[in-house]
């Protein structure tokens, strides 16, 4: 068969192989909020619908820095209801992994300790290491610049499709254009 993707694992992590069920289990303890650093060089996200919960997968998502900050990170994506996620400051099982911080907004934590997406739709995931906040909320996306009619960051709102998969806008002018996601967690 096809070669399996290698799994990056930190030292002293117990691994159990269950040949009767054709499964393996990596016994990882997620970092407590106080053990998650207040800044990071990167924040990664993996899920059961992308990356196959494997930090060695090509499907691992790198969150984007907010401006030039080392503590605030975002990612906008469409997720199916029930998608499970985990985050990390490195792409290694047992090193820097977390699923909840002190303030968790817009999601539940499963019995396995994983973040669970509440309903199918497009969400903005916001991780603020400084305030120890993870927020998963519906995005509001605006366009701005001369093509949008001005440089106010909230001048031209995009419209979300009924299935929540796409957002669209018609530009009133030609010229420069930027996209600005409003991040509700910044208001908290």
Please report, for each region that a protein language model flagged, where it lies by residue.
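Insoluble glucan recognition modules
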Residues: 1-188
